[in-house]
């Protein structure tokens, strides 16, 4: 699948097959996250990949809109060093790279907000996350049980402005 196809076909999926993702594919997906742009090339990110069913269940119980995480093959929790003033932007870029790399492998995903959520502290403690890191996102990964249709999006004419607004 070429890059533009990946961008245009990506959909948020919340229903997954009970099928593991091979470790080498997970590593390659994370490597794509590692290659994301970051302000001043600081690369402030760390990625926790979770495949253990009990841990996935724990995260799904804590994450407000992530109840489906328990059924995912894996989830990735993206962290950034919080003293970096651009940690949110950098972590979001890494998150999107992971989602797009997964799609290129035929793996579906759903980005669950993690930043400044009430559940961040509990999940951080459970995963033994150092205190200098801030949760940016949780990404559920797995092979979809569905083929979601494209959702309605604003037209290009509604959002594109040439030269001035």
Language-model features, listed with the residues they occupy:
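Acidic, surface-exposed loops and disordered segments
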Residues: 1-165
